[in-house]
Structures are given as structure tokens and as C-alpha cells.
């Protein structure tokens, strides 16, 4: 049995608090991968992470996080770009998470890290090679 550690938050005396809870018997998707990315918020840069989970289920492409419309349009840019390098999106449930959650992600600078992390989750790029990579850029 695989245990997943989740962070649970709440309010106690007007102060946020967090604790770790373990849920036995839950597994992540068979293909999970993460990459470091960066973005701009006004004139300030910030560190971000792009995570993908490819799992069995109805084929869909979900993007989670505080995203601008330009980032949401990445679905089609990624589909076309991956098709041109003979690496089509899998016919499975793809969930892409952009963090940190409190900052609006905008622009096309998240296209490249999203493409790389999808390729790594499919096994077409070794996931261990992405651990020390920072990716920012568009695809076309």
C-alpha cells in the first residue's frame, strides 16, 4: 500500500495552521512528474512548479491553478507541437497543476515546461533529468 501525504489547512484562533495526514491505500497516477519553472507577475519574477499526472480515465486535459486565458490556451499549442515531433498526447486523463496557487500565471512561458513534463510522464524524456532543470518558454 502506498501512502500519500497531504497538507490540510484550516483556521484556529484566526491563525492558519497545517498538519500532515496520511491516507493509506491511495496511489498517485502511474505517470507523475514535476519540473521547476518561472514566471512574471508585473515586474517581479517568481518560482513556479508544473506537475502532471497521467492516469487511467476518460481522456481529458485538465489544467489546475490560478491561470490566465493565455495559459489555458496552451492545450491546443501543446497538442499541435507534440504532434509535430511525433509525441501525441496520450488518450488518458491528463491533469496539469501550476503552483504556487496564489499567483496568476499568464503568458506563454509555461508552454515549454508543460510540454517537457508531459513528455517525461510518458517516459519519452527521463524524469530524473528534469530535477535540476528550470524551463521557461513557449512552443510553436
Feature names for model-found ranges:
Residues 3-140:
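Peripheral, non-AAA+ core regions of ATP-driven protein-machinery
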Amino acid at each position: 500500500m502506498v501512502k500519500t501525504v497531504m497538507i490540510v489547512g484550516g483556521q484556529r484562533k484566526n491563525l492558519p495552521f497545517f498538519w500532515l495526514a496520511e491516507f493509506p491505500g491511495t496511489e498517485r497516477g502511474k505517470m507523475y512528474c514535476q519540473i521547476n519553472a518561472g514566471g512574471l507577475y508585473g515586474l517581479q519574477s517568481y518560482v513556479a512548479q508544473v506537475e502532471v499526472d497521467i492516469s487511467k480515465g476518460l481522456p481529458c486535459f485538465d489544467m489546475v491553478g490560478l491561470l490566465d486565458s493565455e495559459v489555458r490556451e496552451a492545450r491546443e499549442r501543446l497538442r499541435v507541437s507534440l504532434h509535430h515531433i511525433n509525441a501525441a498526447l496520450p488518450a488518458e486523463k491528463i491533469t496539469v497543476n501550476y503552483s504556487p496557487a496564489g499567483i496568476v500565471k499568464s503568458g506563454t512561458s509555461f508552454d515549454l515546461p508543460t510540454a517537457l513534463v508531459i513528455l517525461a510522464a510518458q517516459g519519452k524524456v527521463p524524469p530524473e533529468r528534469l530535477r535540476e532543470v528550470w524551463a521557461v518558454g513557449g512552443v510553436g
